[in-house]
């Protein structure tokens, strides 16, 4: 009986414990579910609420393992965020589970594992390159520059591309864009405006060698000089080392278009010669094209990589009389186009515009040579009887890959049946094909180029219905592939670290600069561009092209610079961290650029350093001063330690200068171009002032009813030329936001494929050439900043030529631009009242002056009043006995003043020029000490050069001859 009672007691206790345990676990389950239902990620906007998938309790080990869905993995993980998650969830668990060790698994990993190496206290060495490192010669190196970075991206090879591009759609039997035409662009064009003018140059100025699987040159002309079929343009000279035909086939172009599976690099021959170390007797191959148009052309060389190829083949590019030399490692990358650089070339056929290759080398071996290509050109790949009719640069990578000699399997895995899918895959396939056989992809066959990182720059879809909030950025990686390993054996988590860094730093940098941006998800999913590359890779969806608040930033060139610099800095840090090396961020461009005479024929050139408050290491340690004489191109620069330099001028020769800042991390972008001229007989000096620094999006419409960009009101002005416009926006109706068929932002296509000139920052040169043509005056120049900060005293000069271009405070630009700041007004008023002669020209001289004080300045100092805008279609002006035209329509040659000021004289000033419709275009005034000539359009926009010269001579005669 006692045994029975004991048994019943134990049984009842067990049942009670089990019941209590079940209740506790049910309560725990509710707590976990409630935690996830209310969870808000810190710093990340998740499109979907994360949820718990399952949990596992081990009462013996006192552990609780929670498995969450993939959305939980998409947020940012830092040590602090991870610690907070565990602290919060344990605080909500009932007893006894709040004392258990909790672990959260999402996407197959603990959240601790999702902390990137750069933030982790215990870095995961499997994600690092370790002892894998390329220390041979780079694929291409400019050996003419006086400066090389040592703590940047030197000898690092990167594969980088802008998304999408024009493609042939087999389903509709037409060429089309891969993404919709919204807000005057399409993703196929928009992302190039980040990558081409900003990101690639930043990386290259830090020392990187950048491969891009889409054509990078927006030049629509293309000239190919080849040993096959270019009799007058290709010349061989044999002095030491005979030129012979290589055993492998080479490039040869045929007339007409190219069909599927045609490889131009298998159609011809290439040449080779044994090397020599002699500096006196060597053999040369010369490629001298006939340029139909002067302009900027990318230069691509090609060759064969043979067993005894050398790593230091010497190429020289002669560009408008200057020469720049490159060493090319021909042991890699044979049988394709190899980019050297982009240069200015004259029209015509002469020895000052050519490329040469010698057989000089420090090694015994051979150099090989094949075709040389100048310019990006037009698409020439025919699909089902049609070419795109567009510049090659805006086509998809599939077509460039064929033109670049890639195997058929690389660019047409679908055997010509699906160009859309092939274009997605070819970017990564090219990366692997070129990088195969290098230390970073040792188990692939390929061209041995040590590409160690792959990055795709995209924009995304999505918007908020309120039309106000930023949609933001998203990044993508793929870790669950090939057992989580890349080709060299390192963990694919290296790609997640890259994607996380890109996303985190974009948000950090944009918030710092503009006080707003959104971090969206970090996808770890199966995307071709993040799965296929056998090196760390990521896709960065920079913003939404469907969201007007995003694109209001995205269409501003200053924003694109900031975004590109953020990406560059991320790659700089990431690549150096992967190798355990230190790095320095490249500096920003100098400001307050100015040139003044020190004595009669020596100029003092000076500038100021600009520090980046975000980057303490980016301070300049020196500068490169670039010089061009007359119509020649700029030289390769002179290294200057200080912020000034003196140059002795040759009489009668115009000099043009620009400056960049350098440090051990790399080189900044350049300043604007300034000019100087010494005329021994001159008794007067003209100071040219550059007041045109504006880069801007088109005019913005943003109200309760409308959103978008109005190119007719103001097309804005890009940094240099652009291929980024598809057409004018048609639909501004906010109620049609998100409508896929012609909804808000829908745009026309009249501008697609058209190169549109922007602000080249070289208009002082245009003014200087016109003044120098008079042969009467000395010339110096400065930025308007140098006047506003008191670094230049205008009283020293007989005349001031203030060029304002399209400068104005437009109300929507992210940077502040003003034709006449209060400081500049004060300086000009003082100068004019003290007898200085003043020439002012610009499209917004009057219309940018809106306050009573500003209009008083117009009337009292510039002797004019603003009388409206002129949009006379002809762009014709009459004045000084000359009828001439100015650039007033968007074009490839020069920025356009599409709308200009009507300036009426304030008596006793008088009308000096008129537009075709009879409205006043310029005023002149001379009385007492004051002498003025004010133009309502930019002088540099006058199309005819000789008429520019005559007009400038007439203006200066009026201003300076008593």
What positions do the PLM features span?
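Non-catalytic propeptide/linker segments at domain boundaries
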Residues: 66-68, 74-176, 355, 369-390, ...
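Aromatic-Pro/Gly-enriched surface loop or interdomain linker
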Residues: 194-206, 214, 384, 673-798, ...
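Active-site-adjacent mobile loop/cap segments within catalytic or ligand-binding domains
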Residues: 264, 275, 354, 371-379, ...
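Short beta-strand-plus-loop segments that form exposed binding edges in beta-rich domains
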Residues: 355-366
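Active-site microenvironments of hydrolase-like enzyme catalytic domains
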Residues: 394-492, 524-546
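Pro/Thr/Ser/Gly-rich low-complexity, intrinsically disordered linker/stalk tracts
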Residues: 573-617, 651, 665-684
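Beta-strand-rich modules
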Residues: 646-667
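A glycine-rich, often tryptophan-bearing local segment used as a flexible ligand/cofactor-contacting loop or short
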Residues: 802, 806-913, 947, 951-953
């Amino acid at each position: 009986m006692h045994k029975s009672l004991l048994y019943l007691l134990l049984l009842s206790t067990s049942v009670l414990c089990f019941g209590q345990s079940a209740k506790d676990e049910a309560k725990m389950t509710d707590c976990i579910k409630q935690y996830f239902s209310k969870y808000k990620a810190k710093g990340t906007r998740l499109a979907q609420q994360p949820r718990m998938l399952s949990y596992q309790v081990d009462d013996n080990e006192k552990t609780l393992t929670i498995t969450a869905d993939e959305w939980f993995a998409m947020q940012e993980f830092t040590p602090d965020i991870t610690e907070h998650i565990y602290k919060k969830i344990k605080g909500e668990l009932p007893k006894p589970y709040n004392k258990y060790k909790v672990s959260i698994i999402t996407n197959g990993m603990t959240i601790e594992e999702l902390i990137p190496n750069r933030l982790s206290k215990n870095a995961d060495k499997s994600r690092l390159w370790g002892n894998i490192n390329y220390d041979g010669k780079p694929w291409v190196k400019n050996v003419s520059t006086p400066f090389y970075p040592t703590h940047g991206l030197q000898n690092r090879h990167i594969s980088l591309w802008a998304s999408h591009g024009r493609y042939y759609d087999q389903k509709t039997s037409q060429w089309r864009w891969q993404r919709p035409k919204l807000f005057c662009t399409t993703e196929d064009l928009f992302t190039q405006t980040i990558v081409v003018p900003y990101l690639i140059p930043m990386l290259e100025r830090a020392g990187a060698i950048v491969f891009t699987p889409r054509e990078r040159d927006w030049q629509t002309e293309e000239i190919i000089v080849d040993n096959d079929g270019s009799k007058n343009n290709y010349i061989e000279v044999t002095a030491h080392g005979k030129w012979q035909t290589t055993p492998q086939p080479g490039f040869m172009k045929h007339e007409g278009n190219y069909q599927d599976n045609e490889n131009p690099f298998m159609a011809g021959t290439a040449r080779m010669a044994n090397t020599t170390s002699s500096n006196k007797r060597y053999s040369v191959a010369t490629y001298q094209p006939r340029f139909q148009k002067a302009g900027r052309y990318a230069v691509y060389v090609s060759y064969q990589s043979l067993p005894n190829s050398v790593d230091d083949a010497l190429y020289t590019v002669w560009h408008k009389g200057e020469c720049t030399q490159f060493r090319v490692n021909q042991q890699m990358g044979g049988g394709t186009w190899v980019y050297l650089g982009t240069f200015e070339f004259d029209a015509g056929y002469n020895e000052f515009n050519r490329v040469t290759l010698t057989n000089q080398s420090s090694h015994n071996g051979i150099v090989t040579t094949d075709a040389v290509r100048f310019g990006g050109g037009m698409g020439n790949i025919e699909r089902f009887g049609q070419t795109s009719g567009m510049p090659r640069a805006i086509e998809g990578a599939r077509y460039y890959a064929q033109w670049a000699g890639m195997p058929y399997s690389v660019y047409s895995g679908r055997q010509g049946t699906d160009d859309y899918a092939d274009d997605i895959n070819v970017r990564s396939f090219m990366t692997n094909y070129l990088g195969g056989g290098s230390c970073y992809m040792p188990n692939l066959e390929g061209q041995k180029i040590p590409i160690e990182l792959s990055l795709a720059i995209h924009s995304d879809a999505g918007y908020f219905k309120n039309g106000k909030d930023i949609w933001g950025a998203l990044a993508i990686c793929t870790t669950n592939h090939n057992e989580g390993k890349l080709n060299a054996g390192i963990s694919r988590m290296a790609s997640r670290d890259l994607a996380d860094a890109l996303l985190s730093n974009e948000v950090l940098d944009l918030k710092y600069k503009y006080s707003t941006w959104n971090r969206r998800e970090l996808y770890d999913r199966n995307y071709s561009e993040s799965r296929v590359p056998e090196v760390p890779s990521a896709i960065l969806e920079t913003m939404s092209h469907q969201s007007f608040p995003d694109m209001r930033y995205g269409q501003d060139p200053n924003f694109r610079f900031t975004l590109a610099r953020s990406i560059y800095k991320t790659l700089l840090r990431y690549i150096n961290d992967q190798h355990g090396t230190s790095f320095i961020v490249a500096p920003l461009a100098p400001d307050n650029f100015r040139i003044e005479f020190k004595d009669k024929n020596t100029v003092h050139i000076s500038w100021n350093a600009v520090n980046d408050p975000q980057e303490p290491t980016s301070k300049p340690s020196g500068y490169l001063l670039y010089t061009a004489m007359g119509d020649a191109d700029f030289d390769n620069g002179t290294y200057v330690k200080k912020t000034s330099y003196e140059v002795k001028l040759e009489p009668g020769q115009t000099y043009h200068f620009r400056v960049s800042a350098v440090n051990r991390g790399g080189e900044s972008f350049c300043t604007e171009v300034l000019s100087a001229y010494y005329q021994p007989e001159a008794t007067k000096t003209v100071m040219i002032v550059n007041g045109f620094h504006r880069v801007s999006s088109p005019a913005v419409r943003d109200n309760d009813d409308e959103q978008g960009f109005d190119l007719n009101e103001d097309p804005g002005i890009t940094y240099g030329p652009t291929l980024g416009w598809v057409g004018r926006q048609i639909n501004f109706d906010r109620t049609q936001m998100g409508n896929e068929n012609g909804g808000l932002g829908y745009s026309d296509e009249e501008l697609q494929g058209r190169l549109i000139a922007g602000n080249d920052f070289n208009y002082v040169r245009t003014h200087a050439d016109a003044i120098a043509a008079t042969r009467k005056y000395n010339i110096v120049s400065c930025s308007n900043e140098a006047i506003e900060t008191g670094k230049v005293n205008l009283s020293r000069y007989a005349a001031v030529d203030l060029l304002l271009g399209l400068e104005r405070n437009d109300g929507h630009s992210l940077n502040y631009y003003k034709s006449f700041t209060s400081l500049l007004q004060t300086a000009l008023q003082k100068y004019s009242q003290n007898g200085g002669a003043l020439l002012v020209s610009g499209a917004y001289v009057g219309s940018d002056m809106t306050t009573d004080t500003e209009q008083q300045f117009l009337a009292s100092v510039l002797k004019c009043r603003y009388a409206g805008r002129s949009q006379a279609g002809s762009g014709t002006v009459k004045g000084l006995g000359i009828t001439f035209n100015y650039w007033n329509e968007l074009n490839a040659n020069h920025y356009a003043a599409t709308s200009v000021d009507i300036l009426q004289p304030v008596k006793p000033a008088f009308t000096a020029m008129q537009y075709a419709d009879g409205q006043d275009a310029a005023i002149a005034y001379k009385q007492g000490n004051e002498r003025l000539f004010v133009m309502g359009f930019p002088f540099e926009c006058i199309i005819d050069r000789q008429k520019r010269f005559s007009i400038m001579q007439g203006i200066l005669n009026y201003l300076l001859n008593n």
